[in-house]
Amino acid sequence: MKLTCVLIVAVLFLTACQLIAADDSRDLQKFPRRKMRDGMLNTKNTKRQCLPPLHWCNMVDDECCHFCVLLACV
């Protein structure tokens, strides 16, 4: 009986921790590399130049505004 209560409390506590942490990191999960790069590059004097749609790109250092799919900006 005591073990069951301890397990229920532990599960509720861990669920609450997950919900609190999920609010803080909602947008960081999608594109962490791109957001980190944009944060370092976007200062007052620099602005990101986007490649036009259907322009060739690579997955490592893409400069597409949205996505690089099958080596082409979308």
Swiss-Prot record:
Propiece residue ranges: 23-46
Species of the source: Conus arenatus (Sand-dusted cone)
Highest taxon above the source species: Eukaryota
Protein name from the UniProt record: Conotoxin ArMKLT2-041
Disulfide bond residue pairs: 50-65, 57-68, 64-73
The keyword Transmembrane helix is assigned to this record: no
Domain notes: The presence of a 'disulfide through disulfide knot' structurally defines this protein as a knottin. The cysteine framework is VI/VII (C-C-CC-C-C).
Tissue specificity: Expressed by the venom duct.
GO terms under cellular component: extracellular region
Keywords: Cleavage on pair of basic residues, Disulfide bond, Knottin, Neurotoxin, Pyrrolidone carboxylic acid, Secreted, Signal, Toxin
Residues spanning the signal sequence: 1-22
Pfam family for this entry, one: Conotoxin
GO MF annotation list: ion channel inhibitor activity; toxin activity
Keyword field contains Cell wall biogenesis/degradation: no
Subcellular location: Secreted
Family recorded in the similarity comment: Belongs to the conotoxin O1 superfamily.
Residues with Pyrrolidone carboxylic acid modification: 49
